[in-house]
UniProtKB/Swiss-Prot annotation:
Protein name listed in UniProt: Large ribosomal subunit protein bL32
Keywords for the protein's UniProt record, in alphabetical order: Ribonucleoprotein, Ribosomal protein
GO (cellular component) term, any one: large ribosomal subunit
An annotated Gene Ontology molecular function: structural constituent of ribosome
Region of interest called Disordered, as start-end residue ranges on this chain: 1-60
GO biological process: translation
Record's compositionally biased regions (Basic residues): 9-19
Length: 60
């Protein structure tokens, strides 16, 4: 089992962890319907960048 040679100070420990933070996912609002969705993903009703790309089940 590995054993540290010297204790890492709280400051150095914090600097080591500085890149471990999680980012908030990018949320976009569809301009035509006003629904929110993840960026670069279609909205739940099948609209992407103002265009209907998937047919709704009620329309099919």
């Amino acid at each position: 089992m590995a054993v540290q040679q010297n204790k890492k100070s709280p400051s150095k420990r914090g600097m080591h962890r500085s890149h471990n933070a999680l980012n908030v996912p990018g949320i976009a609002v569809e301009p035509t319907t006003g629904e929110t969705h993840l960026r670069h993903h279609i909205s739940p009703n099948g609209v992407y960048r103002g265009r209907q790309v998937l047919k709704n089940k009620s329309e099919a």
